[in-house]
Curated annotation (Swiss-Prot):
It is an enzyme of class 2 (transferase). This is Thiamin pyrophosphokinase 1. SMART domains: TPK_B1_binding (SM00983). Keywords: ATP-binding, Kinase, Nucleotide-binding, Transferase. InterPro entries: Thi_PPkinase (IPR006282), Thiamin_pyrophosphokinase_euk (IPR016966), Thiamin_PyroPKinase_B1-bd (IPR007373), TPK_B1-bd_sf (IPR036371), TPK_catalytic (IPR007371), TPK_catalytic_sf (IPR036759). The gene is tpk-1. Pathway: Cofactor biosynthesis; thiamine diphosphate biosynthesis; thiamine diphosphate from thiamine: step 1/1. It catalyses: thiamine + ATP = thiamine diphosphate + AMP + H(+). Its EC number is 2.7.6.2. The lineage of its organism: Eukaryota, Metazoa, Ecdysozoa, Nematoda, Chromadorea.
Length: 243
């Protein structure tokens, strides 16, 4: 059975999401991201992100949860009424630990949410960017979608098998990438792209699909392994110029 993916739901006001604010380049958090953060049902900040949130305190809400190993937070910062969650495991990144903790709350507590939206994680240090993509692949089979939003892109992992992606064409430049992130040859077929693939072998160091283009609001992907799907947002979307 084909898996239905609706990543653009996170940009709707009615979407009940967890927002995770990552430490990273300040420019990665756009006006749109701030708006999503303020409207999120649950706001979760990694410890390093608290310093940046504090700088924006006049126009962003304080987090409900602050989590991490607390090696990046300014020790003088008052956590106020946020719940502090220590996640000291050094084998995983703050993002992976935060996503795992949120998914556990959905199972163990009364938390209810439709998506996990990650703010940032694609700008700045390259190794941090790769760790973000690794985290997406780690949770690709979760029943709760994990979607990364930075100052220009919307990025998610696509699972093995058949997937149908709903794309809001008006919100994008239509430029997209289908990246075989796993370290093995990945066989991909597609419907709804300018440069279609039919049982095409994608692999790092060989052929990958970048600067492709979405042509319809429904994109079908069939893959032998997990993929990263990225799409570029229109300027007005992430800058909120239209609101």
């Amino acid at each position: 059975m084909s898996k239905k993916l609706k990543p653009f739901e996170i940009l709707e006001d009615s979407c009940a999401s967890v927002c995770i604010w990552l430490n990273g380049e300040p420019t990665a958090i756009s006006n749109r991201a701030e708006n999503l953060w303020n409207k999120a049902k649950y706001r979760v900040a990694t410890d390093g992100a608290v310093n940046e949130i504090l700088k924006r305190k006049s126009f962003v809400e304080w987090p409900h949860i602050i989590c991490g190993d607390f090696d990046s937070i300014n020790k003088q910062i008052d956590t106020k009424n946020a719940k502090v969650v220590h996640l000291p495991d050094q084998d995983y990144t703050d993002l992976s630990k935060s996503v795992q903790w949120c998914l556990e709350q959905k199972t163990l507590t009364s938390w209810e949410f439709e998506n996990i939206v990650v703010l940032g994680g694609l700008n700045g240090r390259f190794d941090h960017t790769m760790s973000t993509l690794s985290s997406l692949i780690r949770f690709v089979d979760s029943q709760t979608p994990v979607i990364v939003l930075d100052s220009r892109n919307l990025v998610l992992a696509v699972p093995t098998g058949d997937s149908n992606l709903d794309v809001n064409l008006e919100m994008t430049t239509k430029m997209c990438g289908i990246i075989p992130i796993v370290q093995k040859e990945t066989i991909v077929s597609s419907i709804g792209l300018k440069y279609e693939m039919e049982n095409l072998a994608l692999e790092f160091g060989k052929l990958i699909s970048t600067s492709n283009e979405v042509t319809t609001s429904q994109v079908f992907l069939k893959s032998s392994s997990s993929l990263i799907f990225s799409i570029e947002l229109e300027n007005w979307v992430y800058k909120l110029d239209s609101l």
